[in-house]
A protein has these predicted regions:
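ATP-dependent carboxylate-amine ligase
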Residues: 2-167
């Protein structure tokens, strides 16, 4: 930016005006919790999302929402190639598994060696919302496959936590 003569103030102003595209590091509140929704579609994307949240300098609750609809890809075996083991290096006091394949993603989290007593499976995305609201941390990251993200956003929009538009 310095090469082009753009001041730090102008860069900051640009970032302040920008909006995240839905599901792509979209931020919102659930109750008093600061939440970030990240779309995951394959092992590389999931691993990169995990690398990103690993940079958080605070404890957070992790929710992973896994669906297996046509738009997601029916085969979810890719979760075994994603680096979920990296959660062992993060300050995550609680993890929630949701979506149509909640038991599969819960199993994947258990296999990492993460304390299985800290993993809660949720039958519905509404249950995930309630779990996030009741969590002990101030922050939550929600990693979701495409249709799980759409369904979760629909619930968020009905609670006015996000807009209904899908930019």
């Amino acid at each position: 930016a310095e090469f082009f003569g753009v001041s730090p103030e102008k860069i900051k102003a640009g970032f302040d005006k920008s909006r995240a595209v839905f599901g792509r590091q979209e931020t919102f509140k659930i109750g008093d919790k600061s939440c970030t929704l990240v779309l995951i579609k394959n092992p590389v994307g999931a691993s990169q999302a995990l690398d990103m949240i690993k940079l958080a300098p605070y404890p957070f609750t992790l929710s992973v929402l896994l669906n297996a609809n046509y738009a997601d890809g029916i085969d979810t075996s890719w979760i075994w190639d994603a680096n979920f083991e990296s959660i062992l290096d993060m300050d995550i006091p609680q993890a929630f598994a949701g979506g149509v394949r909640h038991s599969e993603i819960a199993r994947r989290l258990r296999v990492t060696g993460y304390d299985e007593d800290k993993i809660t499976e949720a039958e519905s995305l509404e249950d995930i919302m309630a779990l996030i609201e009741a969590q002990s941390t101030d922050h939550a990251y929600i990693l979701a496959t495409y249709t799980a993200m759409l369904q979760f956003r629909e619930i968020l929009a009905s609670r006015h936590a996000v807009g209904k538009e899908m930019n």
